């Protein structure tokens, strides 16, 4: 079968192993990326209203259809974001 090879994007680019180096665990990576993706989504939603409360993508978007999560993962991989681990504020369960 002739044709061009697919160039997958999203969770396969950047590789998950590189993304895990930026966080303590895969769970914190999920939270980290999801929060940033929500900020990017809110930014795009606000553009039509003239409000600029959120910061837009920090990496160049190559495709107008690129999902906010893919953008967030590329930002994390590029080292453009920082995050802090906050101690639980809930008292221990007895």
Swiss-Prot record:
Pfam families: RNA_pol_Rpb6. It comes from the Bacteria. InterPro entries: DNA-dir_RNA_pol_omega, Pol_omega/Rpo6/RPB6, RPB6/omega-like_sf. SUPFAM superfamilies: RPB6/omega subunit-like (SSF63562). Keywords: DNA-directed RNA polymerase, Nucleotidyltransferase, Transcription, Transferase. Its EC number is 2.7.7.6. One of its GO terms (cellular component) is DNA-directed RNA polymerase complex. It catalyses: RNA(n) + a ribonucleoside 5'-triphosphate = RNA(n+1) + diphosphate. It is an enzyme of class 2 (transferase). The keyword Nucleotidyltransferase applies. The keyword Transferase applies. One of its GO terms (biological process) is DNA-templated transcription. GO terms for molecular function: DNA binding; DNA-directed RNA polymerase activity. The RNAP catalytic core consists of 2 alpha, 1 beta, 1 beta' and 1 omega subunit. When a sigma factor is associated with the core the holoenzyme is formed, which can initiate transcription. Promotes RNA polymerase assembly. Latches the N- and C-terminal regions of the beta' subunit thereby facilitating its interaction with the beta and alpha subunits. HAMAP family: RNApol_bact_RpoZ. Belongs to the RNA polymerase subunit omega family. This is DNA-directed RNA polymerase subunit omega. It comes from Frankia casuarinae (strain DSM 45818 / CECT 9043 / HFP020203 / CcI3). The lineage of its organism: Bacteria, Bacillati, Actinomycetota, Actinomycetes, Frankiales. The gene is rpoZ.
